[in-house]
Amino acid sequence: MDVEVKKENQNTQLKDHEVKELIKNSQNGDQKARDLLIEKNMRLVWSVVQRFLNRGYEPDDLFQIGCIGLLKSVDKFDLSYDVRFSTYAVPMIIGEIQRFIRDDGTVKVSRSLKELGNKIRRAKEELSKSNGRIPTVQEIADYLEISSEEVVMAQEAVRSPSSIHETVYENDGDPITLLDQIADQSEEKWFDKIALKEAIKDLDEREKLIVYLRYYKDKTQSEVADRLGISQVQVSRLEKKILKQIKNQMDHFES
């Protein structure tokens, strides 16, 4: 059964108390409860998987790894936690996929993306020399006759993700990586981003790009404006419109 089928295999969402009852039964050895938890959380796993696409891995492989993280979160979830299971599970799923990519030892980027990334780098250098400043994303896109979205996505795809595994603090030989810090921060923040991912499907390409840069790359409005070649005021107005548009979808996702 492929990922697309898995995505559609969740017709109804369980209430929080139903999820916790299933977790309790699963931890007591109930295989049916365990299977139902997996089935009802497939969309959540797929939402996390989408963060790691365009790295050369098969979506279905990443989905299977994500399900391992989901199962671990079922086994380790403390029922005394005053938190939704999905909020607890997201960092576990992310961590499992990150470990898979790290242990694989390679970052697989398609040849076409690598070539486009090199073209963008050369264009950026040439435009910087001719203009006396760093070019905007739109200027690079116009120069290469491609869309601004293609510029941003290619740059992100070829950028090394190794920084997330860099040691940011070490105490008595026990290193703490950036990934550890991310997982230890507010789990609600991660779940908010996953909910947002589900809610932006109906946005146009520029709106999606603004959401991607602001909420997934934590760029400021000024940075987004520079990359898109528009003013900060325009970004602010567009963002307000976008947030208003997706509010109902996010409320539905989290209900």
UniProtKB/Swiss-Prot annotation:
List UniProt keywords, sorted A-Z. DNA-binding, Sigma factor, Sporulation, Transcription, Transcription regulation
Question: Key word Kinase present in the record?
Answer: no
At which residues is the DNA-binding region annotated? 221-240
Keyword Transcription regulation tagged: yes
Offer one example of a GO biological process linked to this entry.
Answer: sporulation resulting in formation of a cellular spore
Query: Which CDD domains does its entry note?
Result: Sigma70_r4
**What would you give as a GO molecular function for this chain, any one?**
sigma factor activity
Q: Which domain of life is it from?
A: Bacteria
Where can the motif Polymerase core binding be found? 61-74
Which PANTHER family does the protein's record reference? RNA POLYMERASE SIGMA FACTOR RPO, RNA POLYMERASE SIGMA-F FACTOR
Q: Which family does it belong to?
A: Belongs to the sigma-70 factor family.
Please explain the role this protein plays, according to its UniProt record. Sigma factors are initiation factors that promote the attachment of RNA polymerase to specific initiation sites and are then released. This sigma factor is responsible for the expression of sporulation specific genes.
What protein does this entry describe? RNA polymerase sigma-F factor
Taxonomic classification: Bacteria, Bacillati, Bacillota, Bacilli, Bacillales
